Each structure stands twice: as C-alpha cells, then as structure tokens.
Amino acid sequence: MSIQLIYELAVPPTRMAEVHQLFADRYLPEASERGMNFTGAYITPPIELDDAPTTLVMQFTLPDANAVWAMKRQVTDSPEIAQFWLDVDGIVVSRQRRFLAPYERG
C-alpha cells in the first residue's frame, strides 16, 4: 500500500519562485535516495496571490509504511535537511506535513 506525503507551505506574495527553487535545488535531488517519488508541485488557490499567501503543495509517494520510517530516520540524521527546513521556515508563513494512506474498509 503506497503512502502519500504532502507538504503544504503558505508562501508570502512574491516568494513562490524562491521556495520552489529551494526544493528543486536542495530537497528533490536526494529525495529518491530516501525512497520518495516526487509526483508534483501544486498551488492553491490555482493562481499565485499578490496580496496574501499562496499555498504550495509538494506531493511525494513512498512505497509503504516501512519506507516512511526509513525516510524519517534519514531526514532526522541529516544536517543538510535540517538547514533546508530552517531556510524554508525563514520564508514561509507556515508549513504542514501530512502522510496519507488509502482507506480500506475492513
């Protein structure tokens, strides 16, 4: 059962390209080594606002729960990832991470 990892970042006006570039340069290159398959970047609302934050949604897929725990261990042990998130936090208004699994009615 694959797991979806969703990052939601509230990005202030005029900073979207900067935050997206941080992900492209410093997070995405090693994501696959952590078992993460990048599936897309989205914004909501569907236009970049110039008077309020726009939410950048970064979506990844991991193969299963074991891959989630392995990824979390690797990220926890990485000073580069810690610095990446500090840099992101210096820009964004807020951020949230969600893990989603398919609901299987049993």
Residue spans for each PLM region:
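Short, low-complexity cationic-aromatic patches
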Residues: 1-3, 10-15, 19, 32, ...
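Short, well-ordered beta-strand segments in beta-rich or mixed alpha/beta enzyme
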Residues: 3-10, 39-76, 98
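Residue-level signal for secondary-structure boundary sites
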Residues: 15, 66-68, 105
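Short amphipathic alpha-helical segments
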Residues: 15-41, 76
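Short, solvent-exposed alpha-helical surface patches in well-structured domains
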Residues: 18, 67-70, 83
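Short, flexible helix/strand-to-coil boundary loops that buttress conserved ligand/catalytic motifs
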Residues: 23, 72, 85
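Generic macromolecular interface patches on structured domains
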Residues: 29, 68, 78-81
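Glycine-rich beta-strand-turn "strand-cap" elements at beta-sheet edges
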Residues: 36-55, 81-106
